[in-house]
Regions:
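Glycine-rich, charged/polar anion/phosphate-binding loops
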Residues: 51-53, 274-277, 304, 333-335
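Non-transmembrane, aqueous-exposed alpha-helical and coiled segments at domain scale
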Residues: 301-304, 310, 316-348, 354-403
């Protein structure tokens, strides 16, 4: 990896407008922060990004399944060893169940080590007579409702880098150091089935997985792949000063990569075809995703393919659909049909979270577990009818026992939300709800064969 200022400085079109960017009050402080980031070592390597691209190509071809999960918005305070371990543990547990249900390898991607910024509907928030800048994630400002806390501070971008580095260090230690051993993960899942009041429903599948592992052990099969896993990082490429400052020229190929994460996506609110985010995504060689909401037209989808993957490189482009449970069965089919007919190679992933948010009577933002599940069901039904591959799921989750989404086997109610509502932004599935979803999606994967 090299950082060649001449080629990088001319890489991106500076004349384009960028949506959802903070109004940094101190331009010289921003310049200093960007200069510091430009001098930092890469958080990931281009070769790792290429490996992920190859895995995504397999998933797009129906030979793997994508599991992406993590916080809605990471916070500096929650970047603790326990919190990171619990999130990884939850994703590994989900992956083991999905892998068995699908009889396919599962690509494990954390929505972590960089997901510190969020787009907002309004630039300002008003409480009583006081109006302050909206909270845009720890990358920009602080959740506390004071003028100093809400003033965008570019030094936070440097803190994002260091916190992401520490997170990735733990991720690598946990996934390569024996913590991710498939047999250990299965023991955790057995514990979930035994201890959870909804576990009985999933006991049969857990027992099947146990018998399969016992059979392999009896046959002397103990591959290294059981002991370690590849775990990739991802986040929304939102704050362009950060993403551009961490773009490097790969010394092997001379091509630019965003080395802040293996995979980045462009959000529903920033995917303007003539905008700076789309220009950024076009120029980097990482595998990239684009969020597609219910207003997406066929023309939008086909134009994005043409702009972002003109050579139809397998693994380059992932469409993450966020339609809402009530829309997915009507809006998704024409999009999938048109893209398939065009011959484009795209991985289709379902985000069943963002189209299903509503405000509870108490004022908390929440989501119904049944809506989340129904959108995934609709996603699978659409692909089943069209003969295409339901390539993966994108879930906002935590490894902790929070009470942010209602329903599920624990029957969390609107009245329970206040018990442990900890998210910095949108509501997340807790550990139990995440595992319950994995078992239910595993049943869908098994039934689709």
């Amino acid at each position: 990896m090299s950082n060649s200022p001449v080629s990088l400085d001319s890489l991106f079109d500076k004349s384009l407008s960028a949506a959802q960017q903070p109004a940094w009050p101190d331009s010289s402080a921003l310049e200093r922060a960007v200069a510091e980031l430009k001098a930092m070592p890469p958080l990931v390597f281009a070769g790792e990004c290429d490996n992920l691209k190859a895995r995504i190509a397999e998933a797009a071809d129906g030979k793997a399944f994508w599991l992406q999960g993590g916080d809605c918005a990471e916070t500096f305070a929650a970047a603790t060893a326990d919190s990171i371990r619990n999130r990884i543990k939850t994703i590994l547990q989900m992956a083991a169940v999905l892998q068995y249900g699908a009889s396919l390898p599962v690509i494990k991607v954390g929505r972590m080590a960089g997901q510190f910024a969020k787009p907002r509907s309004n630039d300002f928030e008003k409480r009583g007579e006081v109006t302050l800048p909206a909270y845009r994630g720890d990358a920009v400002n602080d959740l506390e409702f004071t003028e100093s806390a809400r003033t965008p501070d570019p030094n936070r971008l440097v803190k994002v880098y260091h916190t992401s580095s520490a997170t990735l260090n733990l991720v690598r230690a946990f996934t390569q150091g024996g913590f991710a051993d498939l047999r250990l993960v299965h023991e955790w899942n057995k514990g979930f089935v035994k201890d959870s009041r909804i576990g009985a429903r999933y006991e049969a599948m857990a027992n099947e997985i146990g018998r399969a592992l016992d059979f392999m052990r009896s046959a002397g099969i103990n591959p290294e792949e059981f002991k370690t896993v590849d775990f990739y990082s991802s986040h929304e490429a939102l704050i362009l000063e950060y993403e551009k400052a961490l773009t490097r020229i790969d010394s092997r190929t001379g091509l630019p990569y965003d080395v802040s994460a293996h995979f980045v996506w462009i959000g529903e609110r920033t995917r303007q075809l003539d905008g700076a985010h789309m220009d950024f995504a076009k120029k980097i060689k990482n595998p990239i995703g684009v969020k597609l909401g219910p207003k997406t037209t066929i023309e939008d989808a086909l134009t994005m393919i043409k702009e972002l993957n003109p050579d139809n490189e397998p693994g380059r482009l992932t469409f993450i659909t966020r339609m809402g449970a009530g829309n997915v069965r009507s809006i998704l089919p024409p999009l999938v049909e048109a893209v398939t007919k065009s011959g484009a190679t795209v991985l289709w992933v379902c985000d069943p979270m963002h189209g299903n948010t509503y405000e509870a009577p108490s004022g908390y933002k929440t989501r119904r577990f049944d809506d989340v599940l129904d959108e995934v069901k609709g996603f699978f039904e659409v692909h089943q009818k069209l003969g295409t591959h339901p390539g993966g799921i994108h879930i906002e989750l935590t490894g902790d026992d929070v009470t942010e989404c209602v329903g599920g086997g624990e029957e969390i109610s609107h009245d329970d939300l206040a018990t442990r509502y900890e998210t910095a932004c949108d509501p997340r599935l807790n550990h139990t709800q995440s595992l319950e979803l994995a078992f239910l999606v595993a049943e869908m994967l098994r039934d689709r064969k």
